[in-house]
UniProtKB/Swiss-Prot annotation:
GO molecular function, one term: RNA polymerase binding
One Pfam family recorded for the sequence: zf-RING_2
InterPro entries to which the protein is assigned, alphabetical: PHRF1/Atg35, SCAF11-like_C, Znf_FYVE_PHD, Znf_PHD, Znf_PHD-finger, Znf_RING, Znf_RING/FYVE/PHD, Znf_RING_CS
Region feature Disordered, mapped onto this chain: 1-79, 324-398, 534-600, 644-871, 888-1240, 1281-1395, 1407-1439, 1455-1486, 1526-1556, 1630-1649
Phosphothreonine: modified positions: T330, T917, T1404
Gene that encodes the chain: PHRF1
Name of the protein this chain belongs to: PHD and RING finger domain-containing protein 1
Assembly and interaction partners: Interacts with POLR2A (via the C-terminal domain).
């Protein structure tokens, strides 16, 4: 209101407010105006603070507007000053009565009026009293106590001070419009947010954020505070002279007044709360409201007076009125009249507005000012609301408005998050050694001096602005019910409020503890061992709200955490806990941030087990860190956060220790485990993905892994809930194999990804959806472990979370983990040297990866996901191998309920038999996990996620072998398959060469894997299950039982895992399988596996490749080479199995696919064998539902793998016959066949996929780094290929590529052979069958396919990219969705596909450098660069716009799942497969579905009813290898386009090609835009030298890729900026921790970008 109005109000208001105040009010107004004019903030700010809200209200209610305006609502300064003066006058008048009593009486810290008869409000979490209207007004903009900043959600209303609580009203979280109207901008950072910490200079009213000051203030000063300029000695505002004099007079009078309060200048002058923009606004609003109310009260009939209080309380409670006493209904009429009259006045006044400033006559000036203010406010609103390019650029560059006298824009000081700031953000009181800062008043001397009340005129006058002076005086006194209506009690300065003790010495100690317990991503560990909050979360802040602070710290980025921490520290943890009730874990309080994040996720997963696991993970300090990262993920993706957070928390808290502790489905024990591995992980900030949860789950079987507690994180086998941590630890210790069992625990699984920063989140996010896997994978890049991890996790969580949440997650955490694993597989697919390729263990591809992915030098871990769900069904064992760089500290393990499964897996690592048994045990112990993982679609992804998380955290590379045992409980529960996924993570030194050390690690890992795979291969049924499991980590739950059934095979594999020779053999097999996998959708995965397996050791990998080529049929021999004797045995055993399967398969047309299946089974026995068996034999039929149909099923499997691989697993098995026939019948319409099965599981899968999709999208940027990583992984297969070449160590890459290059040799095979080989490969990929397995030779075509294994491997690389493109475009989520939509079985097949994609992604990264020559080529065609670009978009839009190939597949082929999984492979027609000119096939990845469906059907039919697509994809892959190599160098999109054109020879292909081209152009445009946005966002960091040129390029590439592959398909500058910032943080972190592979990985992503 205008000063005049205010004066009028005052005049009309009760005597105390009388005219005497008008005079001062006017000067105050004038001064305020001048002040405002000069400061541009003071007047406006005050007005905005107090008046803005009222203005909004007034304008909303015009009548009230006038009244309130008059009462000083217009200008907070004017109003505040006037009111303050009035209050002062009142004080003088009432000095004798009011003030004397007031001195001793408690007074409201906000309005400084003594509590008399007004209603009182107290925040629920502290004992500070405020006038009800004051606290209500305050809560509109900040829900923290004005005194101690404690967060509160409810206000307790009391009739009087000390009275009993009448009622509680929830805080209105609606930010007052005041903020928008006339914001005060910080003079340093130029931002107007955080108003409760935006200090207003008492001299010039300029705003400064506490954290922007130098040095930053830890506490909001209660006394006067002067900005640096005003604090300068001798600085006196010219404007202050006049106005201040009047104020000073009133102040002096007030001080002289013979009242205790007045005699105590401090009491009268000292503010009870700091003067911030928030406090000023609230005071102004309250003052305005009270004056208007008082005015109205005058006209209120006496009889109504008594009801005034009640009405006020009621009004406040109902939110009808801003102020308790503001609008009694009766007095409204008079007010309206007056308002109307005044309005008329205002109108002219407004017209005068322009002259108002010049004319300073009291009334006119005041009116003018106020009107002007309104204008200003409106301007402010407009300015604030509109975000122009210039403003955005200026903000990015750190430019802000020029200083008053300057025309050159000043450069803003970037807001450096500080503990104080973080604490403030969460409402935590600032730390003070002396206790309550306000009680002891330990403020800076500068503040004290400026506010020195002893020299009222000198000190005050020198810098106090009118509003500042007023802030020391009470505002208009609230109308008290007891007071006469005509009398407004004079405002009485209130003595310092007794404040709740804030953190004291003990508090600071606790804060330090909180810091120790923060998620690794939240804390920066310095070389000297000291810790500092990375997120600038003040120690006290963190300590204040253990979970809360972490959540906050962890951040705003982590919305969920934030929501959780919204309460006080206690509230944060408890709030979090409630969310993750199932996860209740001591670690929670310790790891609040993560806890907060986790709870949200936990909420999503209805499975308490999973929640518990997560919670447990949270418990440990390292877990805390990890949880933080997951939090980040959570932040990135709220949908994902619940499950993901839970997982992450679990991972964080229950890292490997958690796993150890939890030997069975119970996830809670896992957290205990976390402690052991947490210590080592803490430094690895990237580890806060949610490994805790996984750890919790694996706890039962994790104990075996405990020896590798340190390695837990590296191993990434922490627990199902704590993949990230486990991964790290594992990467540190080669004996991580035991950890696999830990991973085994279903609940823990989701968090597993959180183990390494990114990877850990990957696990949880994987649980969410396929898309997350890559994100996590990306984030796992060595750079910013913590940050990436956090970001990554969300992406995964979101991506898979929806799936998991909807189906599996709610049922049990296992599903999440399963999904994670799938993601992980994808990530790790081609990342032999790129730890980020943790995704390698895609659901279908996982087993295969196991062989190739494991690096001898890497620590081997076995992750088993137990899902008691389908234990009755034949067990399918899936062994997935993939190499993960140490970027991610942990490799998530399937979070299936039974930790025992995990520990068994670990045991299996120690001993084959043990491993097998354990894997089986997990099935039983996974009762909970299975339940959690019930939604079959998510489970495969869980496993993949786990794999993803398995990546090592730092520079070390780790090979993760995923052994998934899928046991269909019974045909009745086709949707949920119990899958036990055992992951063997091999850690290898940063040197990525697959040579000796790598080879050893890989050998060891391979041995483990081999033993696992042997086990898988041993049991036919188990093998099928395995195939399926391997294909889809998610099916791990369902596979749990199959694993048991495959116990022998598993033990074999486990033994292999544990024994280097076996592991080597397994690796070789895995490699072969990988190749075959890569041929098919699973081939993609396989490729990664191989690349992982081989990548780690150059020699190993090369051997592997040659073996793959040579021994695609005899996987055992290549593996033997790599694995040494055991490898040979393993391979031979697998060979036998494969042959058996082959024989069995011949029973079905799928004979051709058998070899691949078997082979895959060897490396990823579960997935490959599973699929193959499902296709090939009755048993395979039984498990077929579990496994993916070759083509449709495979796509479905991939999809399902992501959404409901397990679910599909069972149904798939039962539906297998149908599916095969359907696919065979309608190869062109595999979708139809898939759709048929989709009804069974499609809903869950789709649900999951859908959820994943949104989450991934959400993750896009905010979670952007995480999600972005995932998306990059998912989206840019071709890009990834390039990245692989660039980022992966050349030697490893070359080695990895070697097999891929060998793949081109494959084309030598007869065209039919090639086609069959490709198909087989795909089939094996889809069916978890190792294309390279010799047994698949049964059919003539299959034999060529087997020969093709090398080609398959090569194709696998392309296939992987293809799958990845699908994965990227479809990603786990999109693909899952599409396939899920297609059909449950399709989903099942999608699991492998997704995995394959994951593998592809991994493979691409791993092979990037070497692949550029050949493997890259293959991959490029498989996953055209354009696809990588579009993948994200496509992945998320896959259903409606699958990657070109996928789309084509969908449009041409009804089996989107298959198409997606094998975009690259399906691309080639049987004829194309035959023709060496298959290169077009790579381009066809997008269109491969159509091609595969159209021409491949023949081959597919030959191979397997469902395998067709897979086979086709494989065939394509085979031929495309050369093309792929070419595309590797050229944009994948181009390669894909070219390849597609060629591959689109069939009409469907042509259509696909068109679609692909369109998609490519669309992606290209999007990429261009993304590049521009990313450059804009990263420029400031680059200019500030925060990132090096290389990092700049890497981040650009990665961010662009992520953005291009976001589900939303839009480029949100804000999200881009967040994504870039996350990347920058990650790289910073990587530099800090000297992550050797950070450089490599970023390039990988960069290539994608």
């Amino acid at each position: 209101m205008d000063d005049d109005s205010l004066d009028e109000l005052v005049a009309r208001s009760p005597g105390p407010d009388g005219h005497p105040q008008v005079g001062p009010a006017d000067p105050a107004g004038d001064f305020e105006e001048s002040s405002v004019g000069s400061s541009g903030d003071s007047g406006d700010d005050s007005d905005s603070e107090h008046g803005d809200g009222t203005d909004g209200e007034d304008e909303g209610a015009s009548e009230e507007e006038d009244l309130e305006d008059r009462s000083g609502s217009e200008d907070s300064e004017d109003d505040g000053e006037t009111l303050l003066e009035v209050a002062g006058t009142q004080g003088k008048l009432e000095a004798a009565g009011s003030f004397n009593s007031d001195d001793d009486a408690e007074s409201c810290p906000i309005c400084l009026n003594a509590f008399r008869d007004q209603a009182v409000g107290t925040p629920e979490n502290c004992a500070h009293y405020f006038c009800l209207d004051c606290i209500v007004e305050w809560s509109k903009n900040a829900n923290s106590c004005p005194v101690d900043r404690t967060l509160f959600k409810c206000i307790c209303i009391r009739a009087q001070f000390g009275g009993k609580i009448l009622r509680k009203i929830p805080v209105e979280n609606t930010k007052a419009s005041e903020e928008e109207e006339d914001p005060t901008f910080c003079e340093v950072c130029g931002r107007s947010d955080r108003e409760d910490r935006l200090l207003l200079c008492d001299g010039c009213d300029a705003g400064y954020h506490m954290e922007c000051l130098d040095p930053p203030l830890q506490e909001v000063p209660v006394d006067e505070w002067f900005c640096p300029e005003c604090a300068a000695p001798g600085v006196v505002l010219a404007a202050d002279a006049g106005p201040v004099s009047e104020e000073e007079v009133s102040l002096l009078l007030a001080d002289v007044v013979p009242t205790t309060s007045r005699l105590r200048p401090r009491a009268g002058r000292t503010r009870a709360i700091a003067r911030t923009r928030q406090s000023e606004r609230v005071r102004a609003t309250v003052n305005r409201n009270r004056i208007s109310t008082a005015r109205r009260v005058q006209h209120t009939p006496g009889r109504l007076g008594s009801s005034l209080l009640d009405e006020a309380i009621e009004a406040v409670a109902t939110g009808l009125s801003t102020a308790v006493y503001q609008r009694p209904l009766t007095p409204r009429t008079p007010a309206r009249r007056k308002r109307k009259t005044r309005r008329r006045k205002k109108v002219p006044g407004r017209k005068k507005t322009p002259s108002g400033p010049s004319a300073k006559s009291k009334s006119s000036a005041t009116r003018s000012k106020k009107r002007q203010h309104r204008v200003k406010k409106r301007r402010g609103k407009k300015v604030k609301s509109e975000a122009t390019t210039r403003s955005r650029i200026a903000r990015t560059l750190g430019l802000r408005r020029p200083v008053h006298s300057s025309c050159i824009p000043s450069v803003l000081k970037p807001v450096e998050p500080s503990l104080g700031l973080l604490r403030a953000d969460i409402g935590a009181a600032s730390l003070s050694l002396f206790g309550d800062p306000y009680e002891l008043d330990p403020f800076d001397s500068s503040e004290e001096l400026s506010a020195n009340p002893l020299s009222p005129l000198s000190a005050k006058r020198r810098a106090l602005s009118r509003s500042a002076l007023q802030s020391h005086q009470p505002v208009a006194r609230p109308v008290s019910v007891g007071l006469s209506r005509r009398r407004l009690p004079a405002a009485v300065p209130e003595p310092d409020l007794e404040e709740e003790p804030v953190p004291d010495l003990l508090g600071s100690i606790l804060s330090g503890q909180s810091l120790l317990m923060l998620g690794s991503s939240d804390v920066i560990i310095h070389r000297d061992g000291s810790l500092s909050a990375k997120r600038a979360a003040p120690v006290s802040f963190q300590r204040n709200s253990g979970s809360l602070s972490r959540g906050e710290e962890g951040f705003k980025g982590c919305l969920q955490p934030r929501a959780l921490p919204s309460g006080s520290p206690a509230q944060g943890p408890s709030g979090n806990r409630p969310q993750s009730t199932g996860l209740s874990c001591q670690g929670r309080s310790r790891t609040p941030a993560r806890t907060a994040g986790a709870p949200v996720r936990l909420d999503l997963p209805a499975a308490p087990g999973a929640v518990q696991a997560r919670n447990l993970s949270n418990g440990s300090v390292p877990g805390f860190r990890q949880s933080h990262s997951p939090w980040f993920n959570g932040t990135n993706k709220h949908t994902l956060p619940l499950a993901s957070a839970a997982s992450k928390i679990s991972s964080r808290d229950s890292k490997p220790p958690c796993r150890s502790v939890v030997p069975g489905p119970p996830l809670k024990p896992a957290p205990r485990r976390t402690d052991i591995s947490e210590l080592p992980r803490i430094p690895k900030i990237r580890r806060d993905d949610g490994g805790g949860r996984r750890d919790a789950a694996p706890a039962h079987g994790q104990s075996i892994e405990i020896p590798s507690a340190c390695i837990s994180r590296l191993t990434g086998r922490e627990g199902t809930g704590q993949p990230g941590r486990g991964t790290r630890a594992e990467s540190e210790a080669s004996s991580r194999v035991p950890r696999e069992p830990g991973v085994h625990t279903g609940s823990s699984r989701p968090p597993a990804p959180s183990s390494h920063g990114s990877l850990a989140p990957l696990g949880p996010s994987r649980g969410k959806g396929v898309g997350s896997t890559f994100e996590s994978f990306r984030i796992n890049i060595p750079g910013n472990m913590a940050h990436s991890s956090q970001l990554s996790s969300p992406g995964f969580c979101n991506t898979f979370r929806p799936v998991d949440d909807k189906e599996q997650r709610k049922e049990n955490p296992s599903p999440l983990f399963s999904i994670k694993k799938t993601k992980q597989l994808r990530s790790e697919v081609y990342d032999p040297s790129d730890p980020t390729g943790s995704d390698s263990s895609a659901p279908g591809s996982s087993p295969e990866r196991s062989g190739p992915g494991l690096l001898p030098s890497e620590i081997t871990r076995t992750i088993s996901i137990n899902s008691p769900k389908a234990q009755t069904v034949q067990a399918v064992r899936c062994v997935t191998s993939y190499t993960v760089e140490s970027i991610f500290g942990t490799e998530p393990e399937p979070p299936l309920g039974p930790s025992s499964a995990m520990s068994k897996l670990r045991g299996a690592v120690a001993a084959e038999g043990a491993s097998d048994t354990e894997r089986e045990e997990p099935t039983e112990s996974q009762g909970l996990a299975a339940r959690l993982r019930r939604p079959s679609p998510p489970e495969p992804w869980d496993e993949e996620d786990g794999a993803s998380c398995s990546t090592f955290f730092g520079s070390e590379e780790r090979t993760v072998t995923c052994v998934t045992v899928v046991e269909p409980e019974a045909p009745p529960s086709p949707d949920v398959l119990q899958a036990a996924t055992h992951r063997v993570v091999e850690l290898r030194p940063p040197s990525r060469s697959r040579s000796t050390s790598s080879s050893r690690s890989r050998k060891k890992a391979k041995r483990k894997r081999v033993s696992r795979e042997h086990g898988r291969t041993r049991s036919g049924t188990r093998s099928e299950s395995r195939d399926r499991s391997s294909r889809s980590a998610s099916p791990s739950v369902g596979e749990e039982r199959p694993r048991r059934q495959r116990s022998k095979a598993k033990s074999r594999r486990s033994s292999s895992d544990r024994s280097s020779s076996r592991e080597r053999a397994k690796r070789k097999k895995a490699k072969d399988k990988s190749r075959e996998h890569r041929r098919g959708p699973w081939g993609h995965s396989r490729r990664t596996s191989r690349s992982r397996s081989g990548s780690p050791g150059s020699s190993s990998y090369e051997h592997y490749e040659s073996r793959k080529k040579k021994k695609r049929r005899s996987a055992s021999r290549p593996r033997g080479r790599e694995c040494s004797p055991t490898s040979s045995l393993e391979r031979l055993c697998r060979h036998k199995h494969q042959r058996e399967r082959s024989h069995e398969r011949p029973d079905r047309k799928e004979s051709v696919a058998w070899p691949r299946d078997r082979r895959k089974r060897r490396s990823r026995s579960p997935s490959s064998e599973h699929r193959a068996r499902e296709h090939r034999r009755p048993r395979s039929r039984e498990k077929w539902p579990q496994t993916r149909s070759h083509s449709p099923e495979r796509k479905g499997a991939v999809r399902e793998a992501s959404p409901a691989p397990l679910a599909q697993g069972e149904p798939g098995r039962e539906d297998l016959p149908t599916r095969l026939p359907a696919l065979g019948e309608a190869h062109v319409s595999p979708e139809v066949a898939t759709a048929d099965k989709a009804p069974l599981q499609a809903p869950p899968v789709l649900e999951v996929a859908a959820e994943c999709e949104p989450d991934d999208l959400d993750l896009d940027y905010g979670d952007s780094v995480e999600a972005g990583h995932v998306f990059d992984d998912f989206s840019s297969d071709a890009v990834f290929i390039q990245l692989d070449d660039m980022s992966s160590p050349p030697s490893p890459e070359s080695t990895d590529s070697s097999p891929e290059r060998d793949f081109p040799l494959k084309p030598a095979l007869p065209p039919a052979s090639l086609a069959v080989a490709a198909i087989q490969r795909e089939v094996s990929l889809m069916h978890d069958e190792d294309p390279s397995q010799p047994p698949p030779l049964p059919e003539g075509t299959q034999e060529p396919h087997l020969l093709r294994p090398d080609a398959a491997e090569k194709a696998e690389a392309p296939s992987s990219p293809d799958v990845a493109p699908a994965g990227k475009e479809d990603s786990p989520s999109a693909s899952g969705r599409v396939q899920e939509a297609a059909r449950p079985e399709e989903v099942v097949s999608q699991t492998p596909l997704l995995r394959s994609r994951a593998l592809v992604k991994r493979v691409t990264w791993n092979l990037q450098e070497s692949e550029s020559s050949a493997p890259a080529e293959d991959r490029a065609p498989r996953a055209p660069l354009h696809r990588p670009q579009k993948p994200r978009e496509g992945a998320w839009d896959m259903e409606d716009v699958a990657p070109t190939g996928v789309r084509q597949v969908f449009s041409e082929l009804p089996f989107p799942s298959h198409v997606l999984p094998e975009p690259g492979f399906p691309d080639t027609d049987p004829s194309q497969v035959y023709s060496p000119g298959l290169p077009p096939a790579p381009a066809q990845p997008s269109s491969i579905p159509p091609c595969a469906l159209v021409s491949q059907p023949t081959v597919q039919f030959i191979l397997q009813g469902s395998l067709p697509l897979v086979g086709c994809g494989a065939a394509q892959t085979l031929a495309p290898v050369p093309a792929a190599l070419t595309p590797a160098s050229e944009p994948a999109s181009q390669a894909t386009a070219a390849s597609n054109s060629e591959e689109k020879t069939p009409a469907p292909r042509l259509a696909a090609e068109k679609t692909k081209k369109e998609e490519y152009m669309k992606k290209l445009h999007m990429q261009e835009r993304a590049v521009e946005e990313v450059k804009l966002a990263i420029k400031p960091f680059y200019q500030k030298r925060e990132v090096t040129k290389e990092e700049y390029k890497d981040i650009l590439r990665k961010a662009v890729q992520k953005i291009c592959h976001s589900k939303s398909g839009e480029i949100n500058p804000v999200k881009v900026a967040n994504l870039v910032k996350a990347y920058v943080d990650k790289y910073r972190h990587m530099r800090r921790h000297k992550k050797p592979e950070a450089g490599e990985e970023p390039p990988t992503q960069g290539a994608e970008g």
